Amino acid sequence: MAEIVLTPGQRAAVESRGCALLVAAAAGSGKTRVLIDRVLDQVIREGRRVDEFLLITFTQAAAAELRGKLLAELNRRLAADPENRHLQRQLSRVYLAQISTVHSFCAALLRDYAHVLELPADFRLADEQEAAALRERAVRAVLEEAYADPSPAVRAALDLPGAGRDDRALQELIVRVYTNLQCYPDPAATADRWEVMLDVTDCTDPGQTIWGKWLLRELQRGLQSDAAMLRRALALAEENEAVSAYVPVLQANLLLLEALASAGSWEALARIPPDFGRFPAIRKCADPETQERIKRLRTDTVARVRRRLEPFSLQPDETLRELSGSAEALRGLLALTRAFSARFAAEKSRRHLLDYNDLEHFALRLLTDRSGAPTAAAREVAGRYAEILVDEYQDTNRVQEAIYSAISREGRNVFLVGDVKQSIYRFRLADPTIFLEKYRTFAEEPAEGEPRRILLSDNFRSHAEILSAANDVFRLTMTERTGGLVYGDAEALRADRKSVV
């Protein structure tokens, strides 16, 4: 039987102990092998049982696959050491091991502790069609009541653009705000914070409001993209004598974008006139195709920049008046969202139903007190597990993160595996910044007991040529702004097709 050879990074991920571990595992780097080997390394070397580990995966299919691979690896090791009684006992315990999605884990917790939370013992999970029907019933009831006796803020929300005759857009907006709030450990407190942030009463500079700060950030991000388009046009002009007359104008345009991007405040932006000038005429251009391409790049870019600058065209006092009106409507929207949340919860409670958000929030309520500290139940649950291993960690949200924290031993017995490049569930409100926060703060060579970061970049699936092309794309597209981190040599994929994974 061929011996499986681990890379240095894989070995570190398997054998490191005594601290929280974040494993940045690129595609094809053998992360499943690492997860299984880490569990079995502790089973063999430390006498652990396989059911002392909590393994969280993203889907039921992934959980079943992981359990199957763990069983297969146990059998492989038993074949090499058939007299090992401890390993023999683990074969039956594989089916007792908690290998599941976070929602299955939460559901099991709620069944065990339903009496603590005063949940009905016969609660069940609503299917999506059922939940959608209850959401629609709840939001319609809330809007009917709002129309009957609206406050000034709610009236402003009811008059939002798109409210329309049938209120479909407003209904969808209320549900969307509600859904976004569910990603936070305390949705009600988060809504209260949002409402405080809307206040522009004593503000004299739009750039100091939450809206202004966001607009300035978005402008800066957008101008970076626009500058890249102009640099492409400039490179074409510099390479071709037939269109070289365009070079000075393009250089001046780039300087203008740099000035706009570095302005940093509302007033500074107002002092920079967005004058892009005109291209000089080129009669009978020797390369009309390149000429047209440069013109199109510049025309499209200038149009985008002008659109980005539109919110900054008003005087500060005019902008603040508009923001104040918007804030009133958004306060009303939050009031409608709170009413919807209460009505939706009541509709589910009457039917003994929970949805996926409920599973997470009731579990968190069980595991933490009002200050966020672990409860007695959390300490009891934490005592079941030697280690918590979370796969696809880049797709975690803040509620799930709080759950893992509550049942860990001060965050030291967690093993977190993911790849921010594969974060594809933002539409389900996953928050890859949780992964990135740890990626930045965990050290590759920490002091004893401190959190550690391990990179797995050796790829066992693809040829070097494919990986080189992928690296080129990631280096161009992944920056601190666009991807949350700079894609450097440490993150680059490396071909390693020698090892067996």
Region roles according to the model:
Residues M1-A2:
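Acidic, low-complexity intrinsically disordered tails
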Residues L6-G9, V14-E15, A20-A24, V34, ...:
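Conserved helicase NTPase motor core
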Residues E52, Q171-L354, E450-P451:
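Conserved ATP-driven helicase/translocase motor core recognized via long
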Residues H86-R93, R440-G449, R497-S499:
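Short, conserved catalytic or adaptor-binding loops enriched in Gly and charged residues
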Residues G164-T179, L455-V501:
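Helicase-core coupling region on the C-terminal RecA-like lobe
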